[in-house]
Regions:
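A short, exposed helix-loop element centered on a Lys and neighboring polar residues
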Residues: 109-110, 154
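Substrate-binding pocket helix/loop in short-chain dehydrogenase/reductase
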Residues: 85-86, 93-95
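N-terminal Rossmann NAD(P)H-binding glycine-rich loop of SDR-like oxidoreductase domains
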Residues: 14, 22
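Rossmann-fold cofactor-recognition segment
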Residues: 44-56
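Active-site helix of classical SDR
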Residues: 109, 145-148
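Residue(s) in the substrate-gating loop at a strand-loop-helix junction
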Residues: 129
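C-terminal beta-strand-loop-alpha-helix "lid" module of Rossmann-like NAD(P)-dependent dehydrogenases
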Residues: 161-210
Length: 271
């Protein structure tokens, strides 16, 4: 860690969980650089214009931050959600979802890791989701991006542990943020009679659950504890008791028993 204030780079810091993390860590004494496409800042932390979808933007952003000193920690929180049935989503829409949520994270990691190694170590938090552990109907490509992130984070943790870099996957359930309002709908959704009723019900359920979810500050508090822990966990879930119970049930129940419970919870009908 740096001899002065610990320095953290947070992606997706303009809103939602990323912004909450920036505010929380700044209040706790961290030197925060919050990256987003707009470079938004607030209350004393530094804003950085950086688009995780763009190789050169990420390279320039990380290089610029490193010019002022080492990066002690990374919180990779940039992401968004695509709604629609699998067959409704175009390949370009699906690729765009993975581009930000998965490949954007990879871009930042590949720029930050060499500097962390040279500095003797660091902490990395990858913002996953309960949707990276349980497939969410009508958000299949969002779930795919988070399932991919789970695999990446687990493998990465093994690779960099001998180098003094600790990796934690933080897995929030429903969180009350502007993620709900910014969810994108697949263009082919309009006029589709096959999935219309089920999609409308599923999105409505998502929105209600998110509106009643935990505040983003709860996730930020977990992120801070992970970054400041002497022995950070490999995974940390955040959410209401029912969501955490669902994750436990997936690990412990036979598949068919879990599937029946999940269908009921997700409002999925069967024939």
């Amino acid at each position: 860690m740096s001899s002065g204030a610990r320095r953290v780079l947070i992606t997706g810091a303009s809103a939602g969980i990323g912004r909450a993390c920036a505010e929380d860590l700044h209040a706790a004494g961290w030197a925060v650089t919050g990256a987003s496409r707009r470079g938004t800042t607030s209350g004393g932390w530094t804003g950085l214009v950086m688009d995780v979808d763009d190789d050169e933007s990420v390279r320039a952003g990380v290089t610029g931050m490193l010019a002022d000193g080492p990066i002690d920690a990374l919180v990779a929180s940039a992401g968004w959600g695509l709604a629609g049935a699998v067959e409704q989503c175009t390949i370009s829409e699906a690729k765009a979802q993975l581009e930000t949520n998965f490949w954007g994270c990879v871009r930042v990691l590949q720029q930050v890791l060499p500097a962390m190694r040279a500095h003797g170590g660091g902490r990395i938090v990858l913002m996953s989701s309960i949707g990276g552990l349980i497939g969410i109907p009508f958000q299949a490509f969002y779930s795919a991006s988070k399932f991919a992130l789970e695999g990446l984070g687990e493998a990465l943790a093994y690779e960099v542990a001998p180098l003094g870099v600790h990796v934690t996957l933080v897995e929030p359930g429903n969180v009350k943020t502007d993620f709900t309002a910014s969810r994108r709908m697949a263009r082919a959704v309009d006029g589709d009679a096959v999935y219309s009723a089920a999609l409308t019900a599923a999105v409505g359920l998502m929105e209600r659950d998110e509106e009643n979810g935990v505040p983003a500050a709860d996730v930020a508090a977990v992120v801070r504890r992970v970054l400041e822990s002497r022995r950070p966990p490999r995974r940390a879930s955040v959410g209401k008791a029912g969501e955490r119970a669902g994750l436990l049930a997936k690990r412990l129940l036979p598949f068919r028993a879990f599937e029946a419970a999940a269908k009921s919870s997700l409002g999925v009908s069967t024939r």
